[in-house]
UniProtKB/Swiss-Prot annotation:
Top-rank EC class of the record's enzyme: ligase
Keyword list, A-Z: ATP-binding, Cytoplasm, Ligase, Magnesium, Metal-binding, Nucleotide-binding, Purine biosynthesis
Species this chain originates from: Beijerinckia indica subsp. indica (strain ATCC 9039 / DSM 1715 / NCIMB 8712)
Pfam families: AIRS, AIRS_C, FGAR-AT_linker
A Gene Ontology cellular-component term: cytoplasm
Binding residues for Mg(2+) 2: 116, 267
PANTHER family, alphabetized: PHOSPHORIBOSYLFORMYLGLYCINAMIDINE SYNTHASE SUBUNIT PURL (PTHR43555:SF1)
Gene from which the chain derives: purL
Protein name: Phosphoribosylformylglycinamidine synthase subunit PurL
Localization (cell): Cytoplasm
Length: 736
């Protein structure tokens, strides 16, 4: 057995600990830590696990509502969806691993978030993903796109959960640090939810699932640092996933949970056995004693340090009722999984690690989490840019050419090349999968349905973090509303650059202020989430990307709305005000070659009023199609409705703002809807009585999109532009 290395300043720095943090450790334990103890502190005090740069700001977010059963602090958030059922969901990042090893990084990102959900007793029913890649022409990007797509697809498909939605966009600032955020959703009975809080002294602590290897050691620490030029040397820190083992683990856990044997349960995710054991003990005000000789290992000669920090996948830690241990073992053996009693709960609030007859660590368990450094980092708030007057922008090309270019651009073009690798229909409950405003799934055999979405407009967040944060929430709220769902709750994934840069910290604070204000105004609490900082590569920070995942409920899923034009002759109505806002728009960036201007202002009261009105129309089956307007504005939104239905449309262009601003401006709180002609006037009158702008702007029908007198574009030309960009870009890629 090799001797532990001496503790030197270089070793401390290699563990991601700053000199003042190491001094804090010395003060806390009154001595020099052992090598194993240094590894434990490194794991528990890194950014990924401790939230040391973000914790003071996260406290400001709204997390409570009458329908919230469990907010942030557990494996996932839990909300009441009626009839004794709960929806359990969360989003997390696997950004750094997916850049280093895209297939395995993305696959284990899916596996990790699924475990967070079924750890709490829920059966996963859906997953989503938010992907951000660099410039498409970057030499690594095809490899990264192909690897991430195959990783998500292979894990989700093999495990047996449908991947039903998400968002994929591109920006050169992600060249060296792509984003892979995975969201999972599960359903459980409200009286059968399990938590990570250990109770009872002397209860056995049980290791369950796959064996421990050397993969993923210091994965959480790697995720808490910016990339430098040696990123590929970190491939050993990327975990390797086995979706079939995870499926067995799911079934074994759910079966065991019905026996009354489980007191507490925690999946082994970031920081592995260390984090799961410390969290269970600290939450229950108990100590934890582990004997690592009992840990099932797949590699010989593993040290205590390696076993504690391994992030091997498909593993769980449980506190069991002692009298149920034999029954629990039988369940796991039946499913072909490892089961080992590796420790016990104690009453001394110590985290004690034994290995090969020696005590390798003896630390105060509460302080490992509670005494982690908390930073109020310096920040510089982003000043709001100047508003761009639409009439100062001269269209460089015709409106028809602009529409074709936008609909075939990387951000707006079809992502079918990616999503066709996902099974969106497995389990048989998917009503609407990728491509709609929100995914829609049926809940069991009853009438209810869940609507799910995940997205963010990082352009807005960079231009004005406060307004961008508000818009990220309202976009999720609108996406859910557009399918007829009542928005209930949010999970977030806050992806930002280096928090030690005051500009980046200012972006973080600004976005959180906007997110918090919007969630409060819309009764849309945040119940779970993740913070991913240090998303930077060789000094280049990513744009602020606070991903918002939303969940909504339909009491009758058969009344849900979709965006496709259903028939010719329907009236087209525009709900909401159109001023022609071009600042920070895709038209300005992709057509005019400019990245400036203030993003659109979000009116939260108006958002709520229009959304509530629209849901009523959908519930009463007054509409035949609904689509929320975001990137690319009205023209792009109408084009997507036409493409989905295979039917064209003609609209009029009023003269109150320039035509290009009317067609491509990105004003918020707007929906494009279709209705039977005889219903249109009644809808317009009802809207105006509520103070909601509603204009009849056209009719559906024909093989073209007729944009007033400005442009006529064939649906087939739009389809070609929309569908061909990504397959053409990816031609010839072979995944090794």
């Amino acid at each position: 057995m090799s001797a532990d290395p001496p503790i030197t300043p270089e070793l401390v720095a290699a563990h991601g600990l700053k000199p003042d943090e190491y001094q804090r450790i010395l003060t806390l334990i009154g001595r020099e830590p052992s090598f194993t103890e240094l590894g434990i502190f490194s794991a528990m005090w890194n950014e990924h696990c401790s939230y040391k740069s973000s914790r003071i700001h996260l406290r400001k977010l709204p997390t409570k509502a009458p329908w919230v059963i469990q907010g942030p602090g557990e494996n996932a958030g839990v909300i009441d969806i009626g009839d004794g059922e709960a929806c359990i969901f969360k989003m997390e990042s696997h950004n750094h691993p997916s850049y280093i090893e895209p297939h395995q990084g993305a696959a284990t990102g899916v596996g990790g978030i699924l475990r967070d959900v079924f750890t709490m007793g829920a059966r996963p029913v859906a997953s989503l993903d938010l992907l951000r890649f660099g410039a498409p022409e970057h030499p690594l990007m095809r490899h990264l796109i192909a690897g991430v797509a195959s990783g998500i697809g292979s894990y989700g498909n093999s495990f047996g959960v449908p991947t039903v939605g998400g968002s994929t966009k591109f920006d050169r600032r992600y060249n060296g640090n792509i984003l892979v955020n995975a969201m999972a959703v599960g359903i459980a009975r409200q009286d059968e939810i399990f938590y990570a809080k250990a109770t009872g002294v002397g209860n056995p602590i049980v290791y369950l699932g796959s064996k421990t290897g050397r993969d993923g050691i210091h994965g959480a620490t790697m995720a808490s640092a910016a990339f430098e030029a040696d990123a590929q040397e970190k491939r050993p820190t990327v975990q390797v996933g086995d979706p079939f083992a995870e499926k067995l683990l799911l079934e074994a856990c759910l079966e065991l949970m019905k026996t009354g044997a489980v007191i507490a349960i925690q999946d082994m995710g970031a920081a592995g056995l260390t984090s799961s054991a410390v969290e269970m003990g600290a939450k229950g005000n108990l100590g934890i004693e582990l004997d690592l000789d009992a840990v099932p290992c797949r590699e010989p000669g593993m040290s205590a340090y390696e076993m504690l920090l391994s992030e091997s996948q498909e593993r769980m830690l449980m506190v069991l009722a002692p009298e149920k241990a034999a029954e629990a073992e039988a369940v796991f053996r039946k499913w072909g999984l490892d089961f080992a009693i590796i420790g016990k709960t104690t009453d001394d609030l110590r985290f004690v690690i034994k290995h090969e007859g020696e005590i390798k660590a003896d630390l105060p368990i509460k302080e490992l989490g509670d005494e982690a450094p908390v930073y109020d980092r310096p920040s510089v708030l982003t000043p709001r840019p100047a508003t761009i007057a639409a009439d100062t922008i001269v269209p460089p090309i015709s409106h028809g050419e602009a529409l074709l270019r936008l609909i075939g651009s990387p951000d707006l073009a079809s992502k079918l090349w990616i999503t066709e690798q996902y099974d969106s229909l497995i389990l048989g409950n998917t009503i609407q999968g990728p491509g709609g405003d929100a995914a829609l799934i049926r809940l069991g055999d009853g009438p209810k349905g869940l609507a799910l979405t995940a997205d963010v407009t990082q352009r807005y967040c960079e231009a004005d973090p406060y307004e961008g944060g508000k818009q990220a929430v309202t976009m999720a709220w609108r996406n859910l509303t557009a399918v007829g769902a009542l928005p209930l709750a949010v999970t977030d994934n806050l992806n930002f650059g280096n928090p030690e840069n005051p500009k980046i910290m200012g972006q973080f604070i600004g976005c959180l202020e906007g997110i918090g204000e919007a969630c409060r105004a819309l009764d849309f609490p945040i119940v779970s989430g993740n913070v991913s900082l240090y998303n930077a590569s060789e000094g280049q920070d990513i744009p602020p990307t606070p991903a918002i995942g939303g969940v909504g409920l339909l009491e009758d899923a058969s009344r849900g709305a979709t965006l496709s034009i259903k028939r010719p002759g329907d009236a087209i109505l525009l709900l909401g005000e159109t001023q022609g806002w071009l600042g920070a728009s895709l038209y300005l960036r992709d057509i005019c070659g400019r990245e400036d201007g203030a993003p659109p202002v979000v009116d939260l009261a108006l958002e709520k009023r229009i959304g509530n009105f629209l849901r009523g129309l959908i519930a009463n089956r007054a509409l035949t199609a609904v689509h929320t307007l975001t990137d690319g504005g009205l023209a792009v939104g109408l084009a997507k409705m036409a493409l989905a239905g295979g039917i064209g449309a003609r609209i009029d262009i009023p003269g109150h703002c320039p035509a290009h601003a009317y067609l491509f401006g990105e004003d918020q709180a707007r929906y494009l809807v279709t209705a039977a002609p005889e219903k249109a006037e009644a809808i317009r009158i009802e809207a105006e009585q509520l103070g909601i702008a509603c204009q009849l702007i056209g009719r559906t029908g024909g093989p073209t999109l007729e944009l007033g007198q400005e442009a006529s574009v064939a649906i087939e030309d739009l389809r070609r532009a929309f569908e061909e960009w990504l397959p053409n870009h990816m031609t010839g890629i072979v995944i090794e």
